[in-house]
Structure formats: C-alpha cells, structure tokens
Swiss-Prot record:
SUPFAM superfamilies: Recombination protein RecR. It comes from the Bacteria. This is Recombination protein RecR. It comes from Bradyrhizobium sp. (strain BTAi1 / ATCC BAA-1182). Pfam families: RecR_C, RecR_HhH, RecR_ZnF, Toprim_4.
Length: 199
C-alpha cells in the first residue's frame, strides 16, 4: 500500500540510487526536501538544471567542469611536465583538496577489472599514452588505489609507457598520518617498510 503519491515515491526511488543512500535514508531526505521546499528543494532543482546544461567532461584530462579544456588544464601555474593519473574525478578532487599536486591530471574512468568486464578499451588509457609522448611531459604519477584492480591497472600502464621518454612513479603506500601500527593490516605495514624514507 502506497503511503504517498507516485511523484513522491519516484523522488524517493531516485534519491535511493545515490551512493550512500538506502531506501530509509532516501525517504528521510525526500521528507526534508519537501519540508524545506523554498529554502532547499527549489534551489537544488535549479542547481541541478544548471549542472545538466553546463557541466561537461574535459576533452584533455577527463575532469568535469563548465568548460573544456577544464580549469585545471588551462591553469598556466600548473606544471605541464607532470601528469597525475587517477581512476575517477573523485580522486582528482581529493588530491586537489589536499593541495598534493601542481601538475595536470588524467582521469581513466575506472580501473581494469577482468571480473567486472572492464578492459583497456573501456578506459582512457590510449589517450594517456598519447599525452605521455608529448615533448613537455617528463613524469607520469600513478595515483591509483592500492587494490588489486588499481595495481593491475598501474602495471598495465607502466608496460605501455616503456617506449615513452617519461619517468613513471606511483604514490607511496603505508602508514597514514595519525595511524597506529597495531590497527594496520599486514599489507599496509609491509608496503610501509619497503617504501621507508630517511628521517
């Protein structure tokens, strides 16, 4: 038996598709939006309409922005010699929030995952190889997750870049800032020991 009209049920169903929102959370979010119609729902709908009309994928790096090439690619303060390779836009944004890189980026659109049917043709690896051959590029930084799929992707890209005249590096893996050794898994501790640095 339906508790609300089909329009409200549709709103709940659509909200439930968002990451981190299940049916109960979606219902609460829908009720909150409806209660705050003028203060929240109307501005949100307007912002979403603008996003639909203006946001696009950068043809150079794969970032999302209101222009292509994106703001990062056109920033003259960025180091054109360095390309940071990430799996998705969320990873790019995380590095930007941390102010961890002054280079340019390349968004793969995921990682290789044979079990999920994701092969090289499904990612922007060919475009990365083309960019790596540009004369101004001297380093490719693989900022991929330390998962099996992330490491598989990193090895695959490294093999493809053998002929390019670039240094290929990857992010260090190990003990997080504020982390306690007792709570870390064996793989993380092992990687931290192998990648230790002078103090």
């Amino acid at each position: 038996m339906a508790v609300a009209g089909p329009e409200i049920e549709r709103l709940i169903q659509l909200l439930a598709r968002l990451p981190g929102l299940g049916p109960r959370s979606a219902r609460r979010a829908a009720l909150h939006l409806i209660k705050k119609r003028e203060a929240l729902m109307v501005p949100l709908a307007s912002a979403m309409q603008v996003a639909i009309e203006r946001i696009q994928v950068c043809k150079t790096c794969g970032n999302i922005d209101t222009q292509s090439p994106c703001t990062v690619c056109t920033d003259p303060r960025r180091d054109p010699a360095m390309i940071v390779v990430v799996a998705d836009v969320a990873d790019l944004w995380a590095l930007e929030r941390a102010k961890a890189s002054n280079g340019r980026y390349h968004v793969l659109g995921g990682t290789l995952s044979p079990l999920d049917g994701v092969g090289p043709q499904d990612l922007t690896i060919d475009a990365l190889v083309q960019r790596a051959h540009a004369p101004e590029v001297s380093e490719i930084i693989l900022a991929l997750n330390a998962t099996v799929d992330g490491q598989t992707t990193a090895h695959y890209i490294t093999d493809l870049l053998q002929e390019a005249n670039v240094k290929v590096t990857r992010l260090a893996h190990g003990v997080p800032v504020g982390g306690e050794l007792d709570y870390l898994d064996e793989g993380t501790l092992s990687a931290a020991m192998r990648q230790r640095t002078l103090f």
